């Protein structure tokens, strides 16, 4: 039997030969000790140990996660507060980040989202309460910084229309705007010729994707106005006075000649509310799920569409009601009357919350902006007025129009549209927080028929016009808010997302009893009720449990509890309390002197109303 000869000393085994041919992998953090020759392939030198000093060293102050005994269960180390502002960590390549940490936030941007006034000092309270207040303030500051940082993601900007040198934008026609914009925006301008069923009232859905319109001769239709896809089209064979979408585009209400009807997006009648008869105007409150109706009989009715019950039926005692709008800020209903007044209503009160004398004649139209700050009214005296709703409801500006405005509408960014006969004028202010300037119109458009309805489309620079000749979609640059909240009103939501949103909205429904002029008052402390409860408690117990107990010195030993020492200690405490009272009175004296130094105003005279 022959045996294979063993390899000699000079002959290497096959396995050893393969190992010598294999090159060591070169890491990208390793640096060459010497420059390689031209054309030579770079690589680590042979038969030399790897230089370990070139590898990045792990910082010593980093807490590594401990290995879990349970397989597959990740553990996340908690970062101590002291290590938040450490020096920037090195990358694997050993280079430092030239811009370590998050990008700085400008103070002006962070102040816009801040809800805590840092200028006010924290009250002197217990240490535990003070620590809680400090933690809450730190959390609010972090939230405001995150909100300011996320604002950078809102890349959309509002549009605008700017003329050339000295050019009046009111003279720019819609055809010129359509030629200047892109194809997608140009498709949003269209006309529907529906003369045989007019005049028309129209309304956009809350997300701004769908359009519902109803003609005076019974024609009712809804469509996706972006894609021009018709959802339903019916003829109710009865006069249609107003139409409104409910909380979504799946339901809409129609005020017909006799009763109020509710339809779905396929045109099927779901409900007929006979208690709401001879309705002239409709308004929907989305956060309360309330449908407000104004009728010829002078009643303002609130219908809860989530349970199908009448919440309140209020008699305005002002005759026929055909002028109504809502305040989006506090959900208060504004009614215009024939005596020139505008009344503000809430379902929790049987009497109006306030009455404003706006015109010498009857009120023809009322509109409130999205912030609830300004109200626009027009009357039979051909006056168009802007009122401030924050204080004493004083008029800010007024303008006499050649023809009285019969319809008014505010956009999301504060533009005011007024329909006068067959002409539509649009005014714009200096900014979103300023009222619209009535001196010079921003845009003007003439229609083929008399205007009977105005509504700005949410999140689109489009104004919907309903007139005797049909429907017109007008382009208004800078009218809408460019960025929308995807969790609140998402124009691109699917059917499942809409269903989930409906469930959440129903769970978060605001009760009708909470509608008031100032919604911030709900978060304030009811001092009157608190004092009344405290008084009743004192009468019931016979003493005040919260009153400060009189000072009782503690007994001491070794003769220090004698009568003289006890009296001395009581007197010392009384002197301290007296000094505190004197100090407080001295601090209040300068304020009283300043009030006395102010000159008293003269008594008002009956002739002051003639002074301009």
From Swiss-Prot:
Organism domain of life: Eukaryota
Compositional bias annotation for Basic and acidic residues: 574-584
Classification via Pfam families: BING4CT (PF08149), WD40 (PF00400)
Name of the protein: WD repeat-containing protein 46
Location of this chain's protein in the cell: Nucleus, Nucleolus
Quaternary data: Part of the small subunit (SSU) processome, composed of more than 70 proteins and the RNA chaperone small nucleolar RNA (snoRNA) U3. Interacts with DDX21, NCL, NOP2 and EBNA1BP2.
Extent of the WD repeats: 215-273, 275-313, 316-355, 358-397, 400-437
GO cellular component: nucleolus; small-subunit processome
Taxonomy of the source species: Eukaryota, Metazoa, Chordata, Craniata, Vertebrata
Protein function: Scaffold component of the nucleolar structure. Required for localization of DDX21 and NCL to the granular compartment of the nucleolus. Part of the small subunit (SSU) processome, first precursor of the small eukaryotic ribosomal subunit. During the assembly of the SSU processome in the nucleolus, many ribosome biogenesis factors, an RNA chaperone and ribosomal proteins associate with the nascent pre-rRNA and work in concert to generate RNA folding, modifications, rearrangements and cleavage as well as targeted degradation of pre-ribosomal RNA by the RNA exosome.
Primary location class: nucleus
Keyword annotations of the record: Nucleus, Phosphoprotein, Repeat, WD repeat
Modified residues (Phosphoserine): 41
Segment forming the signal sequence: none
GO biological process per UniProt: maturation of SSU-rRNA from tricistronic rRNA transcript (SSU-rRNA, 5.8S rRNA, LSU-rRNA); ribosomal small subunit biogenesis
Region described as Disordered: 1-134, 539-612
InterPro entries documented for this protein: BING4_C_dom (IPR012952), WD40/YVTN_repeat-like_dom_sf (IPR015943), WD40_repeat_dom_sf (IPR036322), WD40_rpt (IPR001680), WDR46/Utp7 (IPR040315)
PANTHER family listed in its UniProt record: WD REPEAT-CONTAINING PROTEIN 46, WD-REPEAT PROTEIN BING4
Compositional bias annotation for Basic residues: 14-26, 112-130
């Amino acid at each position: 039997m022959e045996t294979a000869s063993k390899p000699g000393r000079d002959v290497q085994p096959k396995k050893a030969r393969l190992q010598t041919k294999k090159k060591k992998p070169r890491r990208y953090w390793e640096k060459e000790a010497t420059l390689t020759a031209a054309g030579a392939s770079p690589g680590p030198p042979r038969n030399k140990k790897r230089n370990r000093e070139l590898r990045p060293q792990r910082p010593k102050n980093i807490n590594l996660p401990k290995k879990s005994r349970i397989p597959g269960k990740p553990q996340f180390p908690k970062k101590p507060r002291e290590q938040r502002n450490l020096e920037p960590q090195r990358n694997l390549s050993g280079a430092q980040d030239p811009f370590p940490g998050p990008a700085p936030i400008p103070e002006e941007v962070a102040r816009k989202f801040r809800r805590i006034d840092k200028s006010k000092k924290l009250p002197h309270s217990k240490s535990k309460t003070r620590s809680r207040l400090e933690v809450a303030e730190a959390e609010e500051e972090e939230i405001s910084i995150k909100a300011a940082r996320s604002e950078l993601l809102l890349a959309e900007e509002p549009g605008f229309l700017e003329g050339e040198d000295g050019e009046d934008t009111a003279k720019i026609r819609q055809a010129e705007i359509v030629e200047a914009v892109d194809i997608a925006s140009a498709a949003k301008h269209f006309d529907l010729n529906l003369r045989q069923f007019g005049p028309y009232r129209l309304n956009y859905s809350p997300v701004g994707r769908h359009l519902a319109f109803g003609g005076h001769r019974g024609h009712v239709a809804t469509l996706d106005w972006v894609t021009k896809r018709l959802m339903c089209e019916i003829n109710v064979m009865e006069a249609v006075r107003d139409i409104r979408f409910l909380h979504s585009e799946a339901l809409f209400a129609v005020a017909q000649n006799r009763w109020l009807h509710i339809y779905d997006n396929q045109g099927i009648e779901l409900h007929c509310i006979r208690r709401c008869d001879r309705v002239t105007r409709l308004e929907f409150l989305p956060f309360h799920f309330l449908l407000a109706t104004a009728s010829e009989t002078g009643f303002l009715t609130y219908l809860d569409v989530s349970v199908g019950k009448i919440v309140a039926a209020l008699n305005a005692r002002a005759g026929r009601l055909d002028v109504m709008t809502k305040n989006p800020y506090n959900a208060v209903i504004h009614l215009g009357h024939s005596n020139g007044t505008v009344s503000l209503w809430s379902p929790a009160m049987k009497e109006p919350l306030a009455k404003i004398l706006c015109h010498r004649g009857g009120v023809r139209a009322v509109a409130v902006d999205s912030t609830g700050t300004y109200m626009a009214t027009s009357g039979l005296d051909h006056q168009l007025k802007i009122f401030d709703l924050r204080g004493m409801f004083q008029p800010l500006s007024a303008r006499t129009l050649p023809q009285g405005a019969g319809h008014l509408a505010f956009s999301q960014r504060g533009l005011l549209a007024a329909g006068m006969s067959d002409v539509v004028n649009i005014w714009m202010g200096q900014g979103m927080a300023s009222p619209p300037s009535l001196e010079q119109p921003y845009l003007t458009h003439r229609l083929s028929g008399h205007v009977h309805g105005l509504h700005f489309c949410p999140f689109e620079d489009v104004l919907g016009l309903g007139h005797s000749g049909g429907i017109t979609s007008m382009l208004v640059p800078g009218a809408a808010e460019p960025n929308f909240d995807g969790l609140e009103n998402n124009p691109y939501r699917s059917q499942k997302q809409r269903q989930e949103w409906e469930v959440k909205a129903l769970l978060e429904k605001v009760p009708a009893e909470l509608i008031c002029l100032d919604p911030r008052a709900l978060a304030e402390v009811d001092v009157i009720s608190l004092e009344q409860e405290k008084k009743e408690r004192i009468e019931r117990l016979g003493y005040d449990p919260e009153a400060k107990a009189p000072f009782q010195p503690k007994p001491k030993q070794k003769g220090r509890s004698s009568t003289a020492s006890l009296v001395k200690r009581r007197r010392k405490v009384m002197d301290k309390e007296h000094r505190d009272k004197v100090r407080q009175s001295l601090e209040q004296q300068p304020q009283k002197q300043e009030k006395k130094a102010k000159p008293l105003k003269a008594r008002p005279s009956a002739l002051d109303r003639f002074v301009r």
